[in-house]
Regions:
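Short glycine/serine/threonine-rich phosphate/pyrophosphate-binding segments
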Residues: 32-40, 63-65
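Helical hairpin unit composed of two closely spaced alpha helices linked by a short loop
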Residues: 48-85
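Short amphipathic alpha-helical segments
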Residues: 41-44, 66-68, 94
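P-loop/Walker-type NTP enzyme "switch/lid" segment
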Residues: 1-26, 113-123
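Glycine-rich phosphate-binding loops of nucleotide-dependent enzymes
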Residues: 13, 32, 45, 82, ...
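Alpha-helical transmembrane segments of multi-pass membrane transport proteins
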Residues: 11, 24, 38, 67-70
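C-terminal lobe/tail of nucleotide-utilizing enzymes
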Residues: 70-137
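Inter-motif core of Ras-like GTPase G domains
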Residues: 15-27, 39-60
């Protein structure tokens, strides 16, 4: 595994976004860990984002992270459509939700199938997940 930080990470994100031949996109999903680091700053400065949907797990630490992310997104004046609660790896169905300042768009519940999900071979399932997200937008 390669650990990139600061300018190296920002440069890689910039190169990916500028050198990729994008077709007309309706949606672009950017999967990132929670936070407010260099990747977020680069994406908000370099990409012309029209909206953001955040994803979080229903626990106190994740809610603390997403609140910081919400503040950062607001500083860049990018509209937040809402958030999705990702509970697919948590078998505790009674995990309480904390109230956030943005709309809750939906929730993915625990799935035994997701524990063994193989993105390379289960691409149809990955498409279904994306379609579920888009249906709530």
């Amino acid at each position: 595994a390669v650990a990139w930080r600061g300018p190296m990470l920002s440069s890689a994100v910039r190169q990916l976004s500028n050198s990729t031949k994008w077709s007309n996109l309706d949606f672009l999903f950017i999967d990132m860990p929670p936070g407010t680091g260099d990747t977020y700053l680069t994406i908000f400065k370099e990409l012309n984002l029209s909206n953001v949907i955040l994803v979080t797990t229903p626990n106190k630490l994740s809610y603390a992270d997403i609140k910081k992310t919400i503040n950062l997104v607001n500083k860049f004046n990018v509209p937040i459509m809402g958030y999705i609660e990702n509970n697919i790896f948590n078998q505790d169905k009674d995990t309480p939700s904390e109230k956030l300042s943005i709309n809750k768009l939906g929730k993915f519940n625990f799935s035994e199938k997701m524990l063994n999900f193989d993105l390379d071979n289960d691409i149809e399932d990955a498409n279904l997940i994306s379609k579920k997200i888009i249906a709530h937008v």
